């Protein structure tokens, strides 16, 4: 689905990387507008994988290490690097970055990213690099007794819970985007789609499903749609990270990222 957006192929409505969307808006190459429906959220404390038999267990140990990122501009990576600065005083400049050769967008020159032909996950397993930054690994699909990798933090859930308790931030990764041609043909589509997604989520909850990241029973909706105060704060945080990591030249106006009128839309 992302490929259609990135390659300029025809589409009407799509789920897309929020970081890449903001980057494209900054460069004036976005042929779409977003609506405040955020379909993917995840904490990123568990997104760095190291060798299971290694001694790395805290961000303070990562200065000067070599870390692989398959896609350097991926939203997950943007969140992780920002989190490391805010929470652990680990700057992305303090890391030696390597990536796959094919990238959605060229990494900032200041990051000094070296593109490699090799499989980055295998390089960690072989001890050639120190860690890989990724939402998940192929190694994690294997039986636990033969897995070679583990998350950096010994207790990822505890780190996530502490962060959420202090900040209230449940990181946004993807948003729904609508192609400009579709917007021109169907001006009512954005609000209709927003209402449909809200109704779908309400039905999901009514059937007893749980969208809490840790599986806790709660009456709170941790994935609200719309430009709520908290969602605005989270988008601002992501924009700040993009700016600090030199992906975008300016901090955009949040409302300008979304179709007109969304400030009044309510997720009920």
Residues of each region from the PLM?
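Pocket-lining segment of extracytoplasmic ligand-binding domains
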Residues: 108-205
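Conserved hydrophobic residue
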Residues: 11, 129, 247-248
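Secondary-structure end/capping motifs
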Residues: 177, 182-247
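Short, glycine-/small- and polar/acidic-enriched structural segments
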Residues: 1-93, 97-100, 104
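Conserved C-terminal helix/tail region of periplasmic/extracytoplasmic solute-binding proteins
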Residues: 172, 247-268
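Short, solvent-exposed beta-strand edge segments and adjacent coil->beta transition regions
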Residues: 64-65, 171-175, 222
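Short helix-initiation/N-cap motifs at beta->coil->alpha
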Residues: 1-4, 57, 93-126, 217, ...
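Short low-complexity, flexible loop/linker segments enriched in glycine and/or proline
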Residues: 29-31, 147-153, 264-268
């Amino acid at each position: 689905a992302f490929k259609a957006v990135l390659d300029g192929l025809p589409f009407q409505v799509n789920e897309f990387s929020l970081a890449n969307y903001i980057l494209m808006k900054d460069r004036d190459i976005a042929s779409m507008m977003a609506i405040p429906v955020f379909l993917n959220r995840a904490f990123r404390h568990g997104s760095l994988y190291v060798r299971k038999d290694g001694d790395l267990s805290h961000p303070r140990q990562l200065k000067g290490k070599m870390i692989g990122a398959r896609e350097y501009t991926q939203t997950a990576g943007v969140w992780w690097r920002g989190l490391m600065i805010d929470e652990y005083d680990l700057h992305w400049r303090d890391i030696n970055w390597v990536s796959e050769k094919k990238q959605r967008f060229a990494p900032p020159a200041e990051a000094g990213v070296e593109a490699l032909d090799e499989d980055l996950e295998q390089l960690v397993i072989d001890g050639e690099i120190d860690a890989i930054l990724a939402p998940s690994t192929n190694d994690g699909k294997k039986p636990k007794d033969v897995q070679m990798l583990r998350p950096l933090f010994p207790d990822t859930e505890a780190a996530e819970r502490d962060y959420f308790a202090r900040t209230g931030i449940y990181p946004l990764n993807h948003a729904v985007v609508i192609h400009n041609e579709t917007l021109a043909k169907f001006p009512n589509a954005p609000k209709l789609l927003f209402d449909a997604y809200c109704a779908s989520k309400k039905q999901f909850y009514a059937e007893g499903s749980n969208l809490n990241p840790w599986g806790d029973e709660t009456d709170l909706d941790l994935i609200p749609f719309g430009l709520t105060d908290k969602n605005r704060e989270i988008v601002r945080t992501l924009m700040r990270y993009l700016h600090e990591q030199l992906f975008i030249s300016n901090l955009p106006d949040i409302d300008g990222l979304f179709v007109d009128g969304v400030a009044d839309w309510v997720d009920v």
